[in-house]
Amino acid sequence: MPRIYLSPSTQEYNSYITGAGSEEYFMNLLADAMEPYLLANTIRFTRNTPDMTAASSIAQAARGSYDFYLALHSNASGDGSTEGRQRGIIAFYYPTSANGRRAANIFVENLKEIYPLPSLVTARATTALGEVRQPKPPSVLLEIGYHDNTADAVWIQDNVQNIAENLSRSLAEYFALPFIYPMTPRTGTVVTERDALNVRAYPAMSGQVVGSVPHEAQLTVYGQTDGWYSMGYGNLAGYVRSEYVRL
């Protein structure tokens, strides 16, 4: 199953013009809100911590094995005549990364559905950003609105849950997984006759078997769709038939 490195901003000194918090604060709220969606969609993740930096996040990701690197930021116009006047969302990707470009375009198309100025949601190639240039897997750095613009800052603050769902939906699309809404995690017990319960990479009998859960073992259910549960069992994630799990 897919595994991503999730890197919300660690820039606590970038204050929102509203005074409600910082870039670090709101991007970590966004990452918090994404976690249930990622688990429900069998996307495993490692996440940086606020005391880290972009450089240490990149280094931590380099020590692991990931299918994607996602950095969450909000933007600023900088000093000068445009300060506080710019708006929009930018999905940055590395120019020669086909999958980075594909992911950026998926994020853009989905974010256009919830951002009030869809024409200002764009994808852009760059070699200047470390979190785009240095990760080994395909990567995207999202600049989600301008925190020095009042309208953008308020939009972010009021739409953390909507943005989290939207980004998670984009990740599911990128990994060719059906999007599943999260449920309150529940412990389930495998109730096969004797055999272990197959765990599949996709919620269909044609889905690849990626592991199994022993008879009478307990697993955690995160979501459900059409007779399947999305679940976790130790380090194993995937989909199991719901009739073989007692909640």
Question: Where are these predicted regions, by residue range?
Answer:
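Catalytic-core regions of hydrolytic enzymes
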Residues: 2-89, 94-98
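Active-site-adjacent mobile loop/cap segments within catalytic or ligand-binding domains
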Residues: 4-16, 64, 71-74, 78, ...
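Solvent-exposed loop/turn segments at secondary-structure junctions
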Residues: 11-13, 51-54, 74-80, 96-99, ...
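Long, well-ordered alpha-helical scaffolding segments within enzyme catalytic domains
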Residues: 29-39, 98-116, 153-181
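Catalytic cores of processing enzymes, dominated by hydrolases/peptidases
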Residues: 57, 95-146, 184-187
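SH3-family beta-barrel domains
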Residues: 180-198, 212-215, 223-225, 246-247
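Short alpha-helix capping/helix-loop boundary micro-motifs
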Residues: 203-208
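SH3/SH3-like beta-barrel superfamily modules
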Residues: 210-246
